[in-house]
């Protein structure tokens, strides 16, 4: 339904060019390496099509953090969230090049444009400085207040979950333990923290 995309865009007051999440349609769930994008898999009448939200994978070993020459790309030691400090970012795109997950970062243009002439979203939403790189922060401002990221709060299908994977009693840890899952591009060695239940 793309509600997560809309919730994210509004909560973060993102400029028109900036999306932290994109929802891909995938024909074959279970192996993203061989997935068919924007095309159903199977044979009629037994076709399969799934919707897969893709954003920063907030890796345990983020290659983007190591590649950033200014230290602007950081990993929060308490939450594990990977984020970019716009005041330190020089817009060199090293993090984009280093990231094995295509399209999860955006280089914001020098003069970003908004859909509306008024600020929408959270009062403490990220500042969108021109000529910097931005990405999903799992709504750091919200999780620091004890709330869930906007994409998870507004998911009408309750298909998205947030929590501490190291806490076995958390909902997300229980779901991962009880279900089959895949993680994107595991061969890159970054240990993504986003799990897709199949």
Which residue stretches match the model-derived regions?
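Non-ligating segments of multi-cofactor redox enzymes
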Residues: 1-198
């Amino acid at each position: 339904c793309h509600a997560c995309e809309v919730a994210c865009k509004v909560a973060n007051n993102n400029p028109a060019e900036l999306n932290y999440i994109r929802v891909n349609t995938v024909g074959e769930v279970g192996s993203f390496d061989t997935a068919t994008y924007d095309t159903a898999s199977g044979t009629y009448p037994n076709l399969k099509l799934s919707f897969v939200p893709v954003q920063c994978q907030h890796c345990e070993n983020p290659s983007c953090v190591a590649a950033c020459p200014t230290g602007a790309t950081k990993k929060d030691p308490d939450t594990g969230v990977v984020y970019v400090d716009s005041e330190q970012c020089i817009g060199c795109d090293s993090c984009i090049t280093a990231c094995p997950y295509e399209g999860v970062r955006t280089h914001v243009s020098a003069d970003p444009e908004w859909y509306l002439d008024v600020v929408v979203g959270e009062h403490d939403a990220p500042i969108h400085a021109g000529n910097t790189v931005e990405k999903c922060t799992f709504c750091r401002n919200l999780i620091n207040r004890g709330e869930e990221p906007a994409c998870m709060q507004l998911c009408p299908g309750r298909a998205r979950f947030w929590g501490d994977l190291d806490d076995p009693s958390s909902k997300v840890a229980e779901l991962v333990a009880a279900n089959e899952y895949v993680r994107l591009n595991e061969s890159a060695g970054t240990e993504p923290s986003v799990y897709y239940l199949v």
